[in-house]
């Protein structure tokens, strides 16, 4: 396509976004079908340069203002906090040992020109895990979930990898808890957290706010 946007894979992006919103709509079989159409080796990114800079880096990472990483829990309650050694924590956060705040934003927001994924390929795997769990296909759900939990950074197009031992969750509730936990970690700062909290019925006490306070 002559006027293609640099960094954008149109077909995979359309199928990925279709899968996302079918899941949100409770259309689980259709969500699985759409997710299966996405090539997990391909990437789509919003690209930035010295003139058009990464907006999160410019407004938050570089200023430690607006919002900021607080600690290594990534906003999760203790029962769902990242497992020790989860490689995604080091991907999404960095540590400043000399100047407060100690925890800093990293990942896709660590420089003015860092590209931001339109979607992460692993989101498709988590969509399938959730959809299978919500339709009581627990074996398939656990298989998809463990693809994300055991994935190494080198096996991921964006170098996001937990590299942990597989989950042994055996009930729908336990698997869905693991799906929620891993969505929060794997897709950190992707803008999907509030929708996920609502869909998974998380307590409102876990939220800092329901809406960002724009006038």
Model-derived regions, located:
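Acidic/polar-rich alpha-helix caps and helix-coil junctions
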Residues: 1-74, 78-215
